[in-house]
From Swiss-Prot:
It catalyses: (S)-2,3-diaminopropanoate + citrate + ATP = 2-[(L-alanin-3-ylcarbamoyl)methyl]-2-hydroxybutanedioate + AMP + diphosphate. It holds the Pfam family FhuF. One of its GO terms (biological process) is siderophore biosynthetic process. Keywords: ATP-binding, Ligase, Nucleotide-binding. This is L-2,3-diaminopropanoate--citrate ligase. Belongs to the IucA/IucC family. It comes from Staphylococcus aureus (strain NCTC 8325 / PS 47). Disruption phenotype: Mutant shows a growth defect in iron-deficient medium and is significantly attenuated in a murine kidney abscess model of infection.
Length: 578
């Protein structure tokens, strides 16, 4: 496809996301329309309209490409960007804080345009043969991004040249930039017993002998993009002039940027580094502040304490082992530290995939589930076909490998995993789910009630730790990340190809009832299962409203029909057109 066609395809994906967010957040089309039509009344005279290609019980709808604008008696096809702009203006006009939203509108449209153009560039990579092991390919082939985000691929700060060098969708790898930092100006923390291991692996990654580093200096890896940000920081410059930072330059093994962009993977050493980059990706500048790195290691300490007890051959937790960050002021000074330098230098080391090797069939779920707006097929469709199982049997196996251990972990320990589709990996054997891996502990939390009962609080982490939440909030977060984001995406992806999504939700409900009987002596587990089975609605992030209100850090939630509960009541219909 030519560049113009790629941009058109990217814009098609963008309007699909905007429509799905709008309908979810406005509680529209919660049952399939009999005439397969959708419409948005913009004003007394103007209406946007089009046709569903596929209706999804979880809201992952697909659409025919034509979007019509009806203005009085005239009807014409409008562009995707024009349709998006009109939907956003319509939402802004009905917002409580209309003036603030209108002032923010230009930036929102700029971010959407940025996301569309970035997506078009990444789709170009999708047409090129890419020779790597399947796991690396999976991490680097999430071309469209979050299905319920208005700007899933926006990246403000990266130039076009930076994209080519550092964006995972461009199928790249690169060496890191290393600093030797005096211990007096470096903040460090490690999971108990992991400091020596972190030290060893970082020297291996840098291909630097410890004898080359002066006494009392510690190795600090940085992203090659970020080193230029640090060099402009006054405190960094002062440290360099004082000889407290020695620039070692680019060195060592190449690493692969993963789907999160800032986290990189060393295939040679099977280790992840979560590195700060001062780039706004979707809603946030992707740096690591003090609370984030502290809660990450608190969470890792909890996981380390229960890992042997809760892991099975088919369920693994990948935890962070430690962090290193530049201090804004030398130790001993009483000046309140200015956290910007720490935030822009704090890096976290995460353990790799257990028993990893390049021949294994491991995928990050997000790219496995991704469908293009003009096709119901996905990599997941290919996997299920390869397995030889019926989709229902494949899903049942998947639930046993993922949802069941996640619910058991929560009910037995209070650990609420942020197991969304970019944090979860699945290892397949002949296309059949075999091992589930959950990573990135920054977002996990603990139910104060359960964790206190199990003595994780205060024996492992203090009750005041940012990782400790009220029980209801911990359960709320698990339901969103695991059921709405993860399971909802999975079931709808299978449903797009098989046209039986509601039947699949019936299977999920049946599995929950089976587990309820099997684990009837676990009161918390039974309560969780009954909540999923009986509660008519479930909370989902309202990313479009949050974007309009500029509150991504504290997102708005909306309540949507719970397809597990409604699976027997919701009728299913689809367009005969494909």
């Amino acid at each position: 496809m030519q560049n113009k066609e790629l941009i058109q395809h990217a814009a098609y994906a963008a309007i699909e996301r905007i429509l799905n967010e709008y309908f979810r957040e406005e509680n529209l089309y919660q049952v399939p329309p009999q005439n397969h039509q959708w419409s948005i009344q913009l004003s007394e005279l103007e209406t946007l309209t089009g046709e569903f290609r596929y209706w999804s019980a979880m809201g992952h709808h697909m659409y025919h490409p034509e979007v019509w604008l009806i203005d009085g008696k005239s009807k014409k096809i409008t562009t995707y960007k024009e349709a998006i702009a009109r939907i956003l203006q319509h939402m802004a006009q009905s917002a409580d804080n209309q003036t603030a939203v209108q002032q923010h509108m230009a930036q929102i449209m700029s971010d959407i345009d940025n996301s569309i153009h970035r997506t078009a560039r990444y789709l170009q990579s999708n047409t090129i043969d890419y020779v790597e092991d399947r796991y690396i390919v999976s991490e680097q082939s999430l071309y469209l991004g979050h299905p319920f985000h208005p700007t899933p691929k926006s990246a403000s700060g990266f130039s076009e040249a930076d994209l080519e060098k550092y964006a995972p969708e461009c199928h790249t790898s690169f060496q890191l930039h290393y600093l030797a930092v005096h211990q007096d100006v470096l903040l460090t923390r490690y999971v108990e017993g992991k400091e020596d291991q972190v030290e060893k692996v970082l020297y291996q990654l840098a291909d630097i002998d410890i004898s080359e580093i002066p006494k009392d200096f510690i190795l600090l890896p940085t992203h090659p993009y970020q080193i230029n940000v640090l060099r402009q920081h006054p405190q960094y410059m002062q440290y360099s002039e004082q000889g407290l930072i020695k620039d070692l330059g680019v060195s060592g093994d190449s690493v692969y940027p993963t789907s999160s962009v800032r986290t990189v993977f060393s295939k040679a050493l099977n280790i992840y580094l979560k590195l700060p980059i001062h780039v706004k990706i979707t809603n946030f500048i992707r740096t690591n502040d003090l609370e984030q790195i502290e809660r990450t290691i608190d969470a890792a300490q909890v996981i380390a304490s229960v890992k042997d007890e809760v892991e099975t051959p088919h369920f693994k937790l990948m935890f962070e082992e430690g962090y290193r960050a530049l201090l804004p002021n030398p130790l001993g000074q009483t000046v309140e530290p200015e956290m910007d330098l720490l935030t822009n230098s704090a890096m976290i080391v995460r353990e790799g995939i257990p028993n990893y090797h390049a021949d294994k069939d491991i995928h990050v779920l997000a790219s496995l589930f991704e469908t293009m707006p003009d096709s119901p097929m996905s990599k997941l469709s290919q996997v299920i076909e390869q397995s030889g199982l019926a989709p229902e049997a494949w899903l049942e196996c998947y639930l046993n490998r993922t949802l069941l251990p996640i619910l058991k972990l929560f009910s037995n320990t209070g650990i609420s995993l942020e197991a969304h589709v970019q944090n979860t990996l699945i290892e397949l054997k002949d296309g059949i789910p075999d091992v589930c891996f959950v990573r990135d502990l920054e977002g996990i939390c603990l139910s104060r009630t359960i964790a206190t009962e199990k003595q994780l609080v205060p024996n492992v982490v203090a009750a005041s730790s940012p990782v400790v939440y009220a029980h209801d909030e911990a359960w709320h977060r698990l339901k969103y990340y695991v059921v709405v984001n993860h399971l909802g995406h999975l079931v709808s992806t299978i449903g797009k190809a098989t046209r039986n999504e509601v039947v699949l939700w019936q299977l999920v409900a049946h599995r929950l009832m089976t587990w309820k009987k099997e684990y009837a002596n676990n009161a918390v587990f039974v309560d969780c299962v009954e909540d999923l089975y009986q509660t008519p609605t479930i909370a989902a992030k309202a990313n479009l409203m949050s974007k309009l209100n500029d509150c991504g850090a504290n997102p708005i939630y909306t309540h949507i029909p719970n397809p597990i509960c409604h699976n027997k009541e919701v009728s299913y219909c689809e367009s005969n057109n494909s």
